[in-house]
Amino acid sequence: MFYYMQVGGIFMWPIFFLAVLSLAAVLEKLFLYFVRLRDLGSKFKLDIVKNLNNQTFEKIGEIYQNYKNPLAKVVCAASNFYLTNKNISKSEYEFLIKTMIDDEISKLEKNNWILGICISASPQLGLLGTIVGMIKSFGALSAAGDPTLVAGGISEALYTTAFGLLVAIPALVFHVYFINKNDSIMENLEKIEFLLLKKFEGLR
């Protein structure tokens, strides 16, 4: 690995830095979805819909007070808020729920920009490194007149492009995967909002 870092030139180091950032962001997201949100399965989603349709706000607040996933947090907070503010208007309650949902979405999207930068910058830095390497190689050709110097220089210069793509492609795959996970959670949050407002209207 260190050999390729040396022969690839100075642009290998910022790409390596982006690789470390990308790995850290991916591990953080995997921990979020598979450890912190591990209880957010199909059964939980069905149960929360069932409880919103059949249970009181008091009972709902009790059921979901110890859960840490976004759906449970919104349902619990919205239920408890209604119990202490029963005279609130529908528009105020709807605004409250939307604010809670936006807060949960912002937490889910935290650090997404890191993967975005790695996806965009890594291949660009790799291409820049290759171009700089080729300029040096052709400069060596004009000075020495030996074509073998150019071939060797271009071979080394291409390491940066390859390394940049090796960083960007996995980052892109994970980025798309995480976006799909977020979209699924957001769809469920929208359903929760509808059910909460429906329940609220039923109590008016």
Spans of features found by a protein language model:
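Pore-lining and gate-forming transmembrane alpha-helices of multi-pass membrane transport proteins
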Residues: 148, 152-175, 179
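Hydrophobic membrane-targeting segments
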Residues: 1-44
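Membrane-interfacial helix-loop-helix connectors in multipass membrane proteins
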Residues: 139-151
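Alpha-helical transmembrane segments of integral membrane proteins
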Residues: 12-25, 116-123, 167-171
